[in-house]
Amino acid sequence: MKREREAPSRAFSALRLAPFVYLLLIQTEPLEGVNITSPVRLIHGTVGKAALLSVQYSSTSSDKPVVKWQLKRDKPVTVVQSIGTEVIGTLRPDYRDRIRLFENGSLLLSDLQLADEGTYEVEISITDDTFTGEKTINLTVDVPISRPQVLVASTTVLELSEAFTLNCSHENGTKPSYTWLKDGKPLLNDSRMLLSPDQKVLTITRVLMEDDDLYSCVVENPISQGRSPPVKITVYRRSSLYIILSTGGIFLLVTLVTVCACWKPSKKSGKKRKLEKQNSMEYMDQSDDRLKPEADTLPRSGEQERKNPMALYILKDKDSPEPEENPASEPRSAAEPGPPGYSVSPAVPGRSPGLPIRSARRYPRSPARSPATGRTHSSPPRAPGSPGRSRSASRTLRTAGVHLIREQDEAGPVEISA
């Protein structure tokens, strides 16, 4: 009974192992496919230049391979697809005129751009082959580093200062890495030496005399390297002499500022005096200008007096006070004896005592010059500003005129008694 039961179970186990045996037989047969190799897995490219993504494949088939290059992104980008070296389809605009394929499947990408950086995958298949070969190559694209420089606020520093900063600067370059050198050797680790996260800035805290040296920086990226010229940092020791000189300089500076502050008000007062002097001069000039019309008017009146002396005499006579009575102008007394054979008529009542008595019989008068005209022409013109002299001259003219009239009256005709 036991033997009969074991026979069916063995047959069932053999049936279960049959597929695995078949698979083992298949694996032991030689496989036909494409084998791809590449001399490099990483290529560094420069912007504007070309990069060769080199591969080689091997196959038992003599047919042309189907080659496909892709740039791996979140969504793969097909760069080119071809049969042999003949491109299939249309290239993307950003790859047009920049792609070239070789018979071994290699890709030449010219005029590199920063956007070309990434991982490229190639697939090569042959229709007769069962399997397709694949290979990936990484491409980096960078800008060369320009010559760097070390920037410092000052090349001199005082010992035990708070901090001193050095900055490594350069204009061009991508993916830079910085290294600091002291006297041409890499900077040793020191608690006083602090580097920024990108190591571009070096800060020395609590400067010591041993920090007096040459400093430089090295900048590099995958395709280039640059080294800055060394910068000499001079550290001065603190001393009593330096402190004294510093104190003296501060004192002189404060004194200079004080003197300048005191000098400014004096300049303002000087300007004020000058302004007052100018105002006074302008006032005097204005006063002279006001007096000039009056001075010009007075001489004109003198000229008018010269042209019309009689009018001047009449005006002056009216304006001048009454002249004093001259005893010489009084008439001769009636009791005064006349010449023999003549009788004098008595004075007419009501006449002014100053007027001469005229006789009934008249004789022709002797010609006489006009006293006013002669006197007026002989008198000089009145000067401006001398009224007293003009009045005395008018009085003299009036007195002279009265005398002449009296003389003419006295010399006039008298009655002859029969």
UniProtKB/Swiss-Prot annotation:
Keywords: Cell adhesion, Cell cycle, Cell membrane, Cytoplasm, Disulfide bond, Glycoprotein, Growth arrest, Growth regulation, Immunoglobulin domain, Membrane, Phosphoprotein, Signal, Transmembrane, Transmembrane helix. Residues 385-400 have a biased composition (Low complexity). It is found in: Cytoplasm; Cell membrane. Pfam families: Ig_3 (PF13927), V-set (PF07686). Disulfide bonds join 168-217. The keyword Zinc does not apply. N-glycosylated. Residues 287-308 have a biased composition (Basic and acidic residues). Residues 1-33 form the signal peptide. Residues 262-418 are cytoplasmic. Residues 34-141 form the Ig-like V-type domain. The chain crosses the membrane at residues 241-261. It comes from the Eukaryota. The keyword rRNA-binding does not apply. Glycans are attached at residues 35, 138, 167, 189. InterPro entries: HEPACAM_domain, Ig-like_dom, Ig-like_dom_sf, Ig-like_fold, Ig_sub, Ig_sub2, Ig_V-set. Residues 34-240 are extracellular. This is Hepatic and glial cell adhesion molecule. It comes from Bos taurus (Bovine).
